[in-house]
Amino acid sequence: MITAPAHQISQEAQGFAITVLFLAIVLASVIVAARPAQAQMFEVLYSFQGSPDASGPTGPFVRDAAGNFFSTSAGGGTFGQGTAFKLSGPGKETVLYSFCLQLYCHEGGNPTAGLAGDTQGNLYGTASGGSFDTGFVFQLSPTGGEVVLYNFTGAADGAFPDGRLLRDAEGNLYGNAAGGGAYRNCGLDNAEGCGVVFKVTTTGTEAVLYNFTGGADGAQPVGALVRDQKGNFYGATLTGGKYGYGTVFRLDGGGNETVLHSFRLNQTGHSDGANPNGDLIRDSKGNLYGTTSSGGNLNSDGVVFKLSKTGKETVLYRFQGGLDGIIPLGGLVRDLKGNLYGTTVYGGGYENCYNYGCGTVFKVDTAGREIALHRFTGGADGGNPPGGLFRDAQGISTARLPTAAFQRTARMAAELSSS
């Protein structure tokens, strides 16, 4: 799967359209639909009601050829422990499957990473729990039947899968597991494992493509993988690396890892980012773009960065901790002119959410200038978006927003200028 210049994710091998949407979680249960960008209007498309309906959607959407959207929720459903659901239009939602973490279920739940799909309408994802309580990979049929393809044991095979799965033309699934693996010197008790990159075949056989050691190569891989035309994978680790603050890595088809960049927290004379936490995107020239959740200025408010094919890093913008935003946790989207768009969890000037502000939607242009396109108020528009945006061909971008109540949810869409 190759990320196109406008961050349109190719799902051709899967029969799914290129749109990936993010849910917004807000107290007022609204979708924010701006048209045009200068005159934003808000519209409720669907309010999740909690069990037996879905609750707390956290993963990205995928869209099928008929225009239906599919995703996962961490809560809700028959057992209150997560769902896979379909949104077929305003006010039209169907719970396709209810996950169960109870002892009598022998399954798992709380899926947070969203879904991938194939040409037959099957859906694939990951969730917590499973036979060993360290996560599993599942398949859902078009009729809602579930098959567990693989249960992670928490040993050398990995644990705690993180990020949306990537599916190739042969049906193999690829992803990151933030724990487990051959090296156990990571985690709070130094026994959780440093994480792996894994592959699961159509028959449910799992193979570890790379074991992170927790040293210079990184630890705790996060987010989704990106793949180029040559079959190389790109991803990020939250920690590890030369300085201990995370890496961006490349993994070739033979399982050889190259660290493209090791992040370095603020030190005298140095203002790199630290701890990348969102998905990477890749342009047609092979440059990678992403965000870090800390580093940058002295207050460690995060950065937007670019990496060349050779690993040369350019910090495009350092957040200042005010109206511009604080802590970008999600990934970025990029338009045809090279402008980057994303969200910050805090900042923006409105303190109805926390003392640090309710968050922003921002744009960083090719000259490194940042504009806060929307400052969340914590009211009807929501607040504190932890995820990134998606920008389609019409310039419609979406984000997800959290709420302390975590009861009512909806999708937030904002039409952004493509200029």
Where are these regions (language model features)?
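Extracellular beta-propeller repeat domains
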Residues: 2-419
